Amino acid sequence: MLSVDRDPVALTLTIVAEFATTAERVWQGWADPRQLERWGGPPTSPATVVDHDLRAGGRVTDYMTGPDGEKHHGCWRLIAVDPLRSLTVEDGFADARGQPNDELPTTTVEVRLVETPEKTTMTITSRFKSIADMAQLLGTGQEEGMRLAVGQIDAVLATTTGF
C-alpha cells in the first residue's frame, strides 16, 4: 500500500507506505547508504550517496543523475534520529560540493516507522515553510519523484536480506 496526500492548508506532503517486514529491515534502507541509493531517487534519476552520517547533527549529501546525465545535488541536515523508529531532517538542494544552496527552499522531513506483527508502516511527512515554497518544490516534480522512489522499496526488500 502506498498513498500520497498533499495538504496546502497544513503545508505538508505525506507519503504512507506499508511493508510486510520488520521496522529494522525498513530502517536499514535509511541507515545503509548503498541501500538508500537503490530507492532514494525515482527510477529515471537514481541516487548516489556521497556522505552519510545518520546521527543527530550529521549530514547526508547525495545527487540524482537524470536521464540527460545532469546531476541534481541535495543535502540533509539531521535534526533527530531514533533508530528503528524515526528521523527528522532538513532537506534541501546543494551545490556540487554538497554545500546547501540557500537560494532554494528547504523542507523539514519527518520519517516515522510503526511496526505491528503483520507489517511496518512508514510515514514520510514533508513540511513546507510557506505556500510559495510548497508550490515551487512541488513544481519541480517532488511529489511524483517521492512516490516513485518509495514505490521501489518493495523490490529492494525482495532482492536483499539487509533491507
Question: Language-model features: where?
Answer:
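Short beta-edge strand/loop motif at the mouth of beta-sheet-based domains
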Residues: T14, R34-H73, F163
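Intrinsic-disorder/low-complexity, polar/charged segments enriched in Ser/Thr/Lys/Arg/Asp/Glu/Gln
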Residues: A10-V16, A23, A47, R59, ...
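Hydrophobic ligand-binding cavity/cleft-lining segments
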Residues: M1-P46
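Generic C-terminal helix-cap and adjacent flexible tail
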Residues: A155-F163
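Beta-strand/loop substructures that line and gate deep hydrophobic ligand-binding cavities in soluble
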Residues: E90, A96-E144
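Hydrophobic/aromatic beta-strand elements that line small-molecule binding cavities or substrate pockets
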Residues: A17, V49-H52, G74-A80, T106-V114
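A short, structured loop/turn motif at beta-sheet edges
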Residues: A23-E24, D53-R55, I79-S86, R112-T121
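Hydrophobic pocket/interface hotspot
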Residues: V26, L36, V60, L78, ...
